Amino acid sequence: RNSGPLLLLCCLPGEFHEIGMLFFALAAVDRWYRVLLLGANMTLDQIPEVIEQQPCEAIILSGSARPARGLFQDALPQLVRNTSIPVFVGGGVAERNRETIENAGAICAGKDIKPALGIIDKTLSAAA
């Protein structure tokens, strides 16, 4: 059984492509992370309540499609403000929206799994 940090994983609102997130979850577990997988099409305003019930060390949001209007300008900054843990955005949507994601206070993890895990490792190590 893994004893590493617990990561909350879910797809962005309107995102139904879970395969990349599932591959990421497998790679994270292989690196001794624990994973709380919420699945596709998750509204971001529900995440703080989940974190209250099951404390996690980071939130990982996944997306490959075009983000919903206002997602990175409104909902993402609100999530960052309403949680005290790092919020990462990964997948193709992250590559195309890096500046907007970072302006929202989240961390762009990119679309490739191994480098994304490196970014998460480094961020969580610095916070410890």
Residues covered by each model-derived region:
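Hydrophobic/aromatic ligand-binding patch that stacks against planar heteroaromatic rings
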Residues: 27, 79, 100
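A short helix->loop->beta-strand "cap" motif at the edges of active sites that frequently abuts
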Residues: 83-85, 106
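Conserved binding/catalytic microenvironments
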Residues: 1-54, 58-75
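Short beta-strand elements of ligand-binding domains
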Residues: 86-92
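Peripheral docking tails and interdomain loops at the edges
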Residues: 92-128
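Short glycine/threonine-rich loop/turn motifs
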Residues: 70, 85, 125
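Helix C-cap/helix->beta junction micro-motif
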Residues: 31, 82-83
